[in-house]
UniProtKB/Swiss-Prot annotation:
Biological role stated in the UniProt entry: IGPS catalyzes the conversion of PRFAR and glutamine to IGP, AICAR and glutamate. The HisF subunit catalyzes the cyclization activity that produces IGP and AICAR from PRFAR using the ammonia provided by the HisH subunit.
InterPro entries: Aldolase_TIM, His_biosynth, HisF, IGPS_HisA/HisF, RibuloseP-bd_barrel
The encoding gene: hisF
Source organism phylogeny: Archaea, Thermoproteota, Thermoprotei, Sulfolobales, Sulfolobaceae
Iron found in the keyword field: no
Subunit structure: Heterodimer of HisH and HisF.
EC numbers on record: 4.3.2.10
Gene Ontology MF: a single term: imidazoleglycerol-phosphate synthase activity
Protein name per the record: Imidazole glycerol phosphate synthase subunit HisF
Pathways per UniProt: Amino-acid biosynthesis; L-histidine biosynthesis; L-histidine from 5-phospho-alpha-D-ribose 1-diphosphate: step 5/9
Superkingdom of origin organism: Archaea
Organism expressing this protein natively: Sulfurisphaera tokodaii (strain DSM 16993 / JCM 10545 / NBRC 100140 / 7)
Gene Ontology BP terms: L-histidine biosynthetic process
A Pfam family recorded for this sequence: His_biosynth
Amino acid sequence: MTAKRIIACLDVKNGRVVKGVNFLNLKDKGDPVELASRYEEEGADEIVFLDITATIEGRKALLEVVKNTASVLSIPLTVGGGIRTIEDVSRILGNGADKVSINTAAVENKKIITEASEQFGAQAIVVAIDVKRVNNSFIVFTRSGTYNTGIDAIQWAKEVEKLGAGEILLTSIDKDGTREGYDIELTKEVNNSVNIPVIASGGAGKMEHFYEVLKVADAALAAGVFHDGVIKIPELKRFLLEKGIEVRV
């Protein structure tokens, strides 16, 4: 059995780490290079950077941050946000990231998944799927959670696997930042539909939430609870081991 992964997520805006609730009301949480290094020391298995500005100025700042962070990390670094073209993918991997996360562009131009996967290997391509419940269905939203695509999330997960994604980063927008727990039903349905790893995201509030979701996902991602020190990664891993979830320590 493969060990489950604990992933620290850093939302980066203009070169700084920020955090909000349901994608809104952003507060400054510090320097990405420092935070990423700290999380690695604490035992995070991977780091995810999501660039939430994706403006031209923001992009330049991001590449600088990616380069500086990748140079100090030995754990995998995934970078997403505003990736629209194969050139974007190439630039981010070229600056030291191990994987890229593609979200809106994957929906609007499916070819990018296959092209990126063929060029850089499926292991480097993560497709991020942001989901809201609409009339009892799980629906894919893009453009930072603002645009209802009308696409069924379970069907989309199956499709991105076929197109060449190596991994799915699954975020519940309903749960994002609430600290009420992950969307277990959503995660379970997606995980049961695909053979590639699923990273659960959105809603971590206490250690039990990680335990619950790691029964149905390959990895659990969190941001706010780590930034605010509500949950310490070494304690979380001990807790999970005691509960019988295999994690790397």
